[in-house]
From Swiss-Prot:
Domain of life the protein comes from: Bacteria
Organism whose genome encodes this protein: Rhodopseudomonas palustris (strain BisA53)
Oligomeric form and interacting partners: Homotetramer, a dimer of dimers. One homotetramer interacts with 1 SecA dimer.
Alphabetic keyword roster: Chaperone, Cytoplasm, Protein transport, Translocation, Transport
InterPro entries attached to this UniProt entry: SecB, SecB-like_sf
Record's GO cellular component terms: cytoplasm
Recorded name of the encoding gene: secB
Name of the protein in its database record: Protein-export protein SecB
PANTHER family documented for this protein: PROTEIN-EXPORT PROTEIN SECB, PTHR36918
Function: One of the proteins required for the normal export of preproteins out of the cell cytoplasm. It is a molecular chaperone that binds to a subset of precursor proteins, maintaining them in a translocation-competent state. It also specifically binds to its receptor SecA.
Main location: cytoplasm
GO terms for biological process, alphabetical: protein folding; protein tetramerization; protein transport
Pfam families: SecB
Family: Belongs to the SecB family.
Amino acid sequence: MTNGNGTPPEAAPPPQLNVLAQYTKDLSFENPNAPASLAPQPQQPAINIQINVGAKALAENEYEVTLSIEGKAEGASSLIFSFELQYAGVFRIVNVPQENLHPLVMIECPRLLFPFAREIIATAVRDGGFPPLMLDPVDFVGLYRQNMDRQAAEAQQASPN
């Protein structure tokens, strides 16, 4: 193909995703019943994990993405431990079509952050006197779809019929 003057058209520049920074915004670990909570438990504790993703534009083509992970381990009668982590990154994203930008920021960016957040949580739990908590991989596509469905339902409820 040529562009009319005999020269081939220039290819569009490829999409780019650069990690400019990664950091812990907030970390909390609580072991409220220590040292009693460190004793062997009669049964496996129930562990509940909540994961959310937030993002905001910082400048043109730059976004801060925050991965929020909260968890609790509960025994038969009391809280064993709890933690909260907000782990964030600053990303530069260029040459991405506008319709693909939101999914990229909310799916791929947290996917890049997750292994680091997982390590921080495992270390905090271990340092709290427990075996390291190894979080299972997260389906960020499913989380994105779930959040988009929830937002659509909320918007539909908010709009008058």
